[in-house]
């Protein structure tokens, strides 16, 4: 009985070590991929170079990330999670909250750098985007569903409007603007105002 417990404990410890190594390898690959994309751009980023920088063979990259696109998907999910954490329970009317979202997305660009940020946004309009990556499943989209839902409760947005659809429209338009390099404060403010006007109850 004691030997069985000892064997079980040893197996558990070995599994924990393997998992820790797996996560460490994945993190190295992720960082190496971001560095490669930053330096060469997404299209030119080379998986063999990424694997070499992480100290693993090429096949190991695909074990952790089925495609290069999956790296950008993870970058975006991480940034979106950070943004909604920073926004918290954002207060204010619909226009002010959407304006805050825009500012936080711009901060994400400064953190990531132009190359990674634009390639990340460009993925939304690419035929190579993994089919499982639906915008409505993103943390930021879910956050916007809640924001728009509150606006519906307050009578600012029609109750029969689809909050998920409206949130997707907002993010898709914003990403399209930013992916072209549009960062003019007045332009982005007009974009928010136009979107809100389109959402509001007539």
List each model region and its residues.
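Alpha-helical DNA-contacting segments of helix-turn-helix folds
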Residues: 65, 71-79
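Short secondary-structure transition hinges
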Residues: 106-145, 179
């Amino acid at each position: 009985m004691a030997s069985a417990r000892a064997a079980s404990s040893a197996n558990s410890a070995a599994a924990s070590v393997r998992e820790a190594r797996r996560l460490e390898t994945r993190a190295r690959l992720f960082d190496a991929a971001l560095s490669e994309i930053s330096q060469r751009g997404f299209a030119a980023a080379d998986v063999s170079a990424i694997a070499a920088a992480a100290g693993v063979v090429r096949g190991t990259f695909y074990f952790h990330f089925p495609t290069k696109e999956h790296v950008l998907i993870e970058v975006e999910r991480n940034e979106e999670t950070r943004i909604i954490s920073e926004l918290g329970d954002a207060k204010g009317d619909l226009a002010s909250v959407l304006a805050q979202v825009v500012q936080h997305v711009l901060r994400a660009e400064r953190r990531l750098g132009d190359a990674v940020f634009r390639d990340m946004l460009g993925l939304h309009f690419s035929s190579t985007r993994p089919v499982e990556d639906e915008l409505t499943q993103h943390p930021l989209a879910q956050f916007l569903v809640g924001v728009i839902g509150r606006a519906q409760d307050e009578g600012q947005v029609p109750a029969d409007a689809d909050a998920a659809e409206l949130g997707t429209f907002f993010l898709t338009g914003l990403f399209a603007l930013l992916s072209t390099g549009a960062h003019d404060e007045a332009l982005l403010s007009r974009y928010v105002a136009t979107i809100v006007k389109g959402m509001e109850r007539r």
